[in-house]
Amino acid sequence: PQTRCAIELGGQDAKMIFFRTNDKGDIEVADMRMNGSCAGGTGAFIDEMAKLMGVGTESGEFEQLASRGTTVHEVSGRCGVYAKTDIQPLLNEGIPTTDLALSALHAVARQTIGGLAQGIDIEPPVIFEGGTLAYNPTLVRVFREQLNLSDDQVIVPRDPQIMVARGAALSLTDMFASSQ
């Protein structure tokens, strides 16, 4: 209930929901933003970057690489095609895949923050939801760093990949209970 912003990353989409306290003291949705038709900055983007590096995502291999990265290189998060043109020369130069995986996650966070917040302050606490964040804890760390959040300003629920489904079920339960 104390959440002020929800960041949800799935395989094909990215969402940011901003909450505020209304005059009655209740939490309500102030604004909601979702990415357009491009999958840049989503799980599909991470899948493409992993494929380019010759590693898997479902096995956790990409996450393991990113967690060991130490240097962030400039990679476009806006478009997978642009990102490939950034990463391929870095691969050819011999940049470690650990750093490239970390760089791709930084690109995802930049794209989400810049593309969805668009002038709205991201106030803590921030909850992180969706499968992309569930399976990439390093991505949550990157968001935390880019947003200058302390550990107590970050909420990662148990099973973040099903938070939306859980919320819908609770909402429907309340709706049907109040109509009887």
Describe each region flagged by the PLM.
Residues 1-10, 15-20, 25, 113-118, ...:
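Conserved phosphate-binding catalytic cores of ATP/NTP-utilizing and phosphoryl-transfer enzymes
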Residues 7-11, 33-41, 103-105, 127, ...:
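Active-site nucleophile and cofactor-binding loops and adjacent substrate-binding regions
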Residues 15-22, 31-32, 46, 74-77, ...:
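Short acidic, glycine/serine/threonine-rich loops at helix termini
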Residues 21, 28-67, 170, 174:
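Glycine-rich phosphate-binding loop plus the immediately following alpha-helix
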Residues 46-48, 156-180:
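Glycine-rich phosphate-binding/hydrolytic loop that grips phosphoryl groups
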Residues 47, 57-91:
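Conserved ATP-utilizing enzyme core subdomain
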Residues 83-114, 161:
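Adenine-nucleotide phosphate-binding core of ATP-dependent small-molecule kinases
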Residues 117-146, 157-161:
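Glycine-rich phosphate-binding loops at beta-strand->alpha-helix junctions
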